[in-house]
């Protein structure tokens, strides 16, 4: 019975470590994406350029994969005695992505309302200009796009970013966790490092 208690306690400790590390790494990932957004803003890149869109998409994918892989490996090696199950890795990376997404939403909302209140309007105008230059776009579709752009607010834009970021996080969490999992050592009784091992 005592052994079962120790195992339950060890499992609780594991999930506490997963949660705490997820928050820490999530804050770091959120800061990385904010830094990237500021670079784009300061450099005044054309967000609607096809090449920019492709490069940015590849860069975001690379950041997610490398960061999630690094975070799970750090957690497994330094905190969880060298083993990590797939559900644990998935939970850890999803927490990271969720925290990063929340930080991004808060930043985007403050950016749209305080730092550059005209930013959304400018982006909307560029979108409409691009659509109007498309001769194959039906008038009805153009009107629908214009209506949606007119209804866009900082809160709506930030929430859309939240949904997108969380979806991306979950997809890459599913993939990366499959490669960062590692079976438990058969001689490991608790799954956690002893104080001597942690020193």
Q: Could you tell me what each predicted segment is?
A:
Residues 1-16, 184-199:
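Low-complexity, intrinsically disordered extramembrane tails and loops of integral membrane proteins
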Residues 5-75:
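Transmembrane alpha-helical insertion/packing segments
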Residues 20-28, 88-100:
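Alpha-helical transmembrane segments of multi-pass membrane proteins
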Residues 32-40, 60-67, 100-104, 108, ...:
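Alpha-helical transmembrane segments of multipass membrane proteins
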Residues 70-88:
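Membrane-helix interface/capping segments
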Residues 106-135:
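Functional transmembrane-helix hotspots
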Residues 130-153:
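Short membrane-interface loop/juxtamembrane segments of multi-pass integral membrane proteins
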Residues 154-185:
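Transmembrane alpha-helical segments in integral membrane proteins
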